[in-house]
Curated annotation (Swiss-Prot):
Co-factor(s): [4Fe-4S] cluster
Recorded catalytic activity of this chain's protein: (2E)-4-hydroxy-3-methylbut-2-enyl diphosphate + oxidized [flavodoxin] + H2O + 2 H(+) = 2-C-methyl-D-erythritol 2,4-cyclic diphosphate + reduced [flavodoxin]
HAMAP family: IspG
Disulfide pattern: none
Pathway per the UniProt entry: Isoprenoid biosynthesis; isopentenyl diphosphate biosynthesis via DXP pathway; isopentenyl diphosphate from 1-deoxy-D-xylulose 5-phosphate: step 5/6
EC class (word): oxidoreductase
Lineage: Bacteria, Bacillati, Actinomycetota, Actinomycetes, Mycobacteriales
Protein name: 4-hydroxy-3-methylbut-2-en-1-yl diphosphate synthase (flavodoxin)
């Protein structure tokens, strides 16, 4: 039996067809049902610190981020947008709250899109016409970003709290104002920190419009909790074709958000799979320390960006079968490991040599695929300096 490397051809099917939407361009990244679901993150730097912000954007880009958002709370941040947008490797979205003048500054600076929060921008309804005209002239989209924590007080008073209906009504009200001014390049988010409320809001929104949807669980929490919340919510929606771009919100470095986002999309066959480690959860049958083995293999292959499935199995029950189905694998037992490549046993090695052997074979397979191994390029994060 021969198992081919990488993703099957044609690509594995998804659970549901994408919801049909209008199409937008955020810089060179398409957003909408005709385009792949994209991954976003947001810089944690002070935007006016241009070098630090560009450095973080470079790190996010290297991690697989498609679109990046930057905060713009002060004039000095608005003044830095043009330089950031000019030097960023990926499209930059300006995140605007409170001051409408920063919307126009972001458009003039060449940002690829602007996110507006209708719940806290002063007298925003009365400025929509100006914003629509400026964004239309620049050819950039607007994201109407409704958030449970800053919901427009009119809808808070009407519904009593940030219900799915309140979030959706707020978003569609603002969208209707833009449409009245002939502007339709809109994407929408209706974020809540409760994934159940968030999913209900996006389901309602998806049924009522054809705008592309930006998915997010706001204030999701620390890395572990936030990952679970986001994965549950995104999986519930994306598996039914709802969602066109995602941002995982974590109290963690932004690169971790990108890693989680990419893994969610890969798990749903919405993005070509990269390196995947398959390992058993261990039990009383395990004859090796599976946890340590899997962690050491993962660490040794960190940075290897190939569609390669590596199975690390701890016993003879499921081990041989899983190892055969992977591109590369080991079935361990009795102080040794059988190494499988493309479904065939190529060697048996002592337990102490399993990690080293798996890494060597992974590098060899990567070379066959024309990929560079970790360390083949200068190590460390990309360095960006703007003088």
């Amino acid at each position: 039996m021969t198992v081919g490397l990488g993703m099957p051809q044609p690509p594995a099917p998804t659970l549901a067809p994408r919801r049909a939407t209008r199409q937008l361009m955020v810089g060179n990244v398409g957003v909408g049902s005709d385009h792949p679901v994209s991954v976003q993150s947001m810089c944690t730097t002070k935007t006016h610190d241009v070098n630090s912000t560009l450095q973080q954007i470079a790190e996010l880009t290297a991690a697989g981020c498609d679109i990046v958002r930057v905060a713009c709370p002060r004039q000095e941040d608005a003044d830095a947008l043009a330089e950031i947008a000019r030097h960023s490797q990926i499209p930059v979205v300006a995140d605007i709250h409170f001051q409408p003048r920063y919307i126009f500054a972001a458009i003039d600076a060449g940002c690829a899109a602007v996110r507006v929060n209708p719940g806290n921008i002063k007298e925003f309804d009365g400025r929509v016409g100006e914003v629509a005209k400026a964004a239309g002239a620049a050819g950039i989209p607007i994201r109407i970003g409704v958030n449970a924590g800053s919901l427009d007080k009119r809808f808070m008073e009407k519904y009593g709290k940030a219900t799915p209906e309140a979030l959706v009504e707020s978003a569609l009200w603002e969208a209707s104002l833009f449409e009245e001014h002939g502007f339709g390049d809109i994407k929408i988010s209706v974020k809540h920190n409760d994934p159940v409320v968030m999913v209900a809001a996006y389901e309602l929104l998806a049924a009522r419009c054809d705008y592309p949807l930006h998915l997010g669980v706001t204030e999701a929490g620390p890395a572990f909790q936030g990952t679970i919340k986001s994965a549950v919510a995104f999986g519930a929606l994306l598996s039914r074709g709802i969602g066109d771009t995602i941002r995982v919100s974590l109290s963690a470095p932004p690169v971790e958000e990108v890693k989680v986002g990419n893994q969610v999309l890969e798990s749903l066959n919405l993005r070509p799979r990269s390196l995947e480690i398959v390992s058993c959860p261990s039990c009383g049958r395990a004859q090796v320390d599976v946890y340590t083995l899997a962690n050491e293999v993962t660490a040794g292959l960190d940075g290897l960006d190939v569609p390669l499935r590596v199975a690390v199995m701890g016993c003879v029950v499921n081990g041989p079968g899983e190892a055969r189905e992977a591109d590369l694998g080991v079935a361990s037992g009795n102080g040794k490991g059988q190494i499988f490549v493309r479904g065939e046993v190529i060697k048996t090695v002592p337990e102490a040599q399993i990690v080293e052997t798996l890494i060597e074979e992974a590098m060899r397979l990567a070379a066959e695929m024309g990929e560079q191994a970790p360390g083949a390029t200068p190590s460390g994060s990309p360095i960006v300096t703007v003088s």
